[in-house]
C-alpha cells in the first residue's frame, strides 16, 4: 500500500506539472502525430503499471521509453492496418484478463487507480489492443516459417526439468516469433519518417 501511495503521489506530481504545460505536437511518425500530452499520459501509465515512482534519476528514462513505445505503436498500427488484422471483443477480453493475471492486477482496482491519476482507461485498452493485434500479425506472417528441432527442446528441458516437451516447443516457437517481430519493427523504423518537433 505504501508503494502504491508513493507511486500515486509521484504520478500526481507529474499530472500537476502536466497542467502547467501547453501540449504540442512532439513527434510526427509517417504523418501520424504524437503530442506531448500522449507522452505524459504514457509516462504516467508506465509508472503505474510498473509500480516504479518517477524521480529525477529515472525521469528521462521514462520519457525515452514512452517516446520509443509510442513511435513503435504508430508503426505497428500502420502494418496492422496494411494487413487488415482485426480482433473481436472476446479475444480482447481474454487478452485483457491474462494481462491482469500476469501482472497481479485487479481490474476494478487498476481502473480506479487510472481514474485517480487522470489516465483514461482507453489508453490502457489501446495499448493492449495494439499488443494483441501485433501478436496476431506476427503469427500470421511468420508462424508457418518456424521450426523446432529435438535438440532445442532437449536443451530447454535440461535447463528447466519441470517443463514438458510441448511447453518447450512453444517456447522455441515464441522465441523465433519474437526475433521476427523485432526484425520487422527494426526494418520499419529504418524506413519510417520520424520528425521530432
Please describe what each predicted stretch is:
Residues 10-11, 195:
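Generic N-terminal leader/processing signal
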Residues 25-49:
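Periplasmic POTRA and POTRA-like interaction domains that precede
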Residues 46-58:
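Short, conserved catalytic-motif segment at the N-terminal edge
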Residues 1-6, 13:
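Sec-dependent signal peptide recognition
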Residues 20-24, 28, 33-34, 57-197:
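Peptidyl-prolyl cis-trans isomerase
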Residues 14-18:
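Boundary at the C-terminal end of the N-terminal hydrophobic targeting segment
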Amino acid at each position: 500500500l505504501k508503494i502504491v501511495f508513493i507511486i500515486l503521489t509521484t504520478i500526481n506530481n507529474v499530472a500537476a506539472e502536466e497542467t502547467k504545460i501547453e501540449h504540442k505536437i512532439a513527434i510526427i511518425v509517417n504523418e501520424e502525430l504524437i503530442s506531448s500530452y500522449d507522452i505524459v499520459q504514457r509516462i504516467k501509465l508506465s509508472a503505474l503499471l510498473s509500480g516504479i515512482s518517477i524521480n529525477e534519476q529515472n525521469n528521462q528514462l521514462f520519457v525515452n521509453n514512452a517516446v520509443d513505445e509510442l513511435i513503435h505503436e504508430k508503426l505497428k498500427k500502420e502494418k496492422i492496418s496494411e494487413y487488415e488484422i482485426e480482433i473481436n471483443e472476446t479475444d480482447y477480453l481474454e487478452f485483457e484478463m491474462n494481462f491482469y493475471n500476469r501482472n497481479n492486477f485487479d481490474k476494478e482496482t487498476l481502473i480506479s487507480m487510472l481514474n485517480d491519476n487522470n489516465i483514461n482507461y482507453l489508453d490502457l485498452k489501446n495499448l493492449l489492443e495494439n499488443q494483441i493485434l501485433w501478436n496476431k500479425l506476427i503469427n500470421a506472417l511468420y508462424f508457418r516459417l518456424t521450426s523446432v528441432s529435438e535438440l532445442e527442446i532437449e536443451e530447454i528441458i535440461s535447463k528447466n526439468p519441470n517443463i514438458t516437451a510441448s511447453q518447450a516447443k512453444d517456447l522455441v516457437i515464441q522465441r523465433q516469433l519474437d526475433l521476427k517481430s523485432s526484425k520487422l519493427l527494426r526494418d520499419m523504423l529504418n524506413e519510417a519518417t520520424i520528425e521530432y518537433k
